[in-house]
A protein has these predicted regions:
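Alpha-helical subdomain
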Residues: 1-72, 166, 171-341
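Conserved Class I S-adenosyl-L-methionine-dependent methyltransferase catalytic core
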Residues: 2, 9-36, 41, 49, ...
Length: 341
């Protein structure tokens, strides 16, 4: 939310209370409340199923109903339409993984924001080894993050596929592709396209599962590695198009330039490079979503932040790409699209 200059103190109270609804939602997902309440149940039944205190369960369910996550009819509760669609684990459109990821970032990032602001980076994080050590120390958190990225991109990726110049592209690299959601959408929209998804070994296993689920294992390959350190596949084949989605914001400027340099070197002449991110305007604080995401990266990564589209455009041109165009892909994100000269 943004503040109304004409508004009163209640705006600040509303902002400060924002954590309450967020915590109720993530706790309900963690407890699988929505799985149980996809049919009407009483608070007593829910408490017994949850092995919870009956009084506490009743108060909690009424709070979820007040938020619109549950519907209450007399003494029975059941999922609202939106909760039933997105928050029941057995359903195809389940999106709870991203909510679990956001809860992890609260516990291990935002909760210690004051220290991070004073010290410059989160506690217990070694910038040079953060990417390699995180999967080993936090396997469940990484799994929630990668499937969460699928939850966020699932609706958007088919729309993005229609906005990119992929007609005629035969070899595409999805660099840092996570669950392969975008590679899947690009392959579905372009029958002649073959894709490679490059990411760390843990995310690569999730990508393999997701690709197989969509019947695209014969057209989408997996290449596991660390794109800051390893060859991204260009030593044996150049790519017609490289897609980099929501990768730069986790890295510092030196790392971002390295990523762009490696991508540019891996392209054929005339090949396209598309970078999607939460780009800031030149003023550095708009749009709101990008500015807030910049703080999110401050809280959760050793060196990440949001970048202006001008900064990234300059790096692209320094690596021999033409001046990029800016294509909005969602209310908060855009794509910088450039061709290799």
């Amino acid at each position: 939310m943004t503040l109304d200059p004409e508004g009163g103190f209640e705006q600040l109270m509303s902002m400060a209370r924002g954590f309450q609804a967020a915590k109720m939602l993530t706790v309900a997902v963690d407890l699988a409340v929505f799985d149980f309440l996809d049919q009407p149940r009483s608070a007593v039944e829910a408490a017994a199923w949850l092995k919870a205190d009956a009084r506490a369960a009743g108060i909690f369910l009424n709070g979820l109903a007040a938020l619109g996550l549950l519907v209450k009819q007399v003494d029975y509760f059941h999922n609202s339409e939106i909760a039933s669609r997105y928050l029941v684990q057995s359903k195809d459109d389940y999106r709870g993984a991203i909510l679990k990821h956001l809860e992890h970032t609260w516990e291990r990032g935002w909760n210690d924001l004051q220290h991070t602001i004073l010290a410059g980076s989160p506690q217990g994080v070694e910038p040079e080894t953060w990417v390699d050590t995180r999967p080993r120390r936090d396997e469940e958190g990484v799994k929630a993050f990668i499937w969460g990225m699928d939850a966020v991109a699932r609706d958007l990726a088919p729309q993005v596929a229609l906005k990119l110049p992929l007609s005629g592209v035969r070899r595409l690299l999805d660099l840092g592709g996570g669950p392969a959601t975008y590679a899947i959408a690009f392959a579905q929209a372009n029958p002649d396209l073959r894709a490679t998804v490059f990411d760390l070994p843990g995310p690569s296993e999730i990508a393999r599962e997701n690709i197989a689920k969509h019947g695209l294992s014969s057209r989408i390959d997996i290449l596991a590695g660390n794109f800051l350190q390893d060859d991204i596949g260009s030593s044996y084949e150049k790519y017609d198009f490289i897609w980099i989605s929501h990768i730069l914001h986790s890295n510092d400027q030196r790392q971002c330039r390295l990523i762009i340099r490696k991508a540019a070197a891996a392209l054929v002449p005339g090949g396209g490079l598309a970078i999607q991110d939460f780009f800031l305007n030149p003023d550095g604080y708009t749009p709101l979503g990008a500015a807030m995401f910049g703080v999110h990266m401050l809280a959760c990564t050793p060196r990440g932040r949001a970048y202006t589209y001008g900064e990234v455009a300059e790096w692209l041109q320094e690596e021999g790409l033409a001046a990029p165009s800016l294509i909005p892909t969602s209310p908060e994100a855009s794509v910088l699209l450039a061709a290799k000269k």
